[in-house]
Amino acid sequence: PTRRGARPRCSRPRTAVPAGAVGIAGEFSAVYPRVSPGGWQLLGTTNTPMWDSNANPPALVQPGDRVRYRSVDKLPELVDHSARSKRAPARLPRMEVIDAGLLTLYQDLGRPGVGDLGVTPSGAADRAAAATANVAVGNPRGATVLENIGGIKLHALTDTVICVTGATARVRLGEMPVHLARPVLVTAGHTVSVDPATVGMRNYVAIRGGIIAESELGSAATDVLSGLGPDPVTTGDVIGVLPRSTGMTDAQLANPLRVSESSDGKTRATLRCVLGPRDDWFGDNVSAFLDTEWT
């Protein structure tokens, strides 16, 4: 039997639902904390803040809480208490972004362990490549890197050491070719260019010292869907790093390739898939999805 108040989802999801929208779908109800796609039936809006990354806990509503929606003619005025002074770590300007390419994000190992808040781990899409870039320049494996799609061009403001890993792409220091997964000294005034990838999609740029970016829920990873983390990198941004680095550089690393090119010129890759969190919603035809070779 259908519970009272239950409504089916929209046959066509909306591409953008406004923040604060109150929606129901099936036996569930929710408030959209940020602008995001969604296919729930919308009842109205609320200005009650549902999320504050600086609060403990960040989510206003916790499992087991009872929530009542009340119709009002006018939303009350609220005082924003979410702003808190945050002391940014010391940073040294190292590189200026001359061209950010199609998309460049700050990424690290993400936000594991907060799935109960509805927050996905996010982080670098190719963690092996990100870790390799960091180790090559003497950073901790999980230090923040730049994750780039479509090429990037950087101008050194001071002498620094960088490493590029990931997809197969041409990397140049000025006009000199540079190998992937090799630490490279870039002197002040010189530029590093990474062309769009020819095999694969994402390249990773690590800078010795570790890139500094705004942290949210313990991570500087940019999650473009939820809006968590720093904004995407844009042309003109200045990339800063920690003032000290004690690790040794490593020029003996291999670039980890997630995608390989076969003799017929096609690329092949194996994608890891985890069903869930509501894997009980899948029917028997899920096996067709898992067993199909996609092209």
Q: Where are the predicted features?
A:
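Conserved "landmark" site that anchors the functional core of diverse proteins
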Residues: 1-295
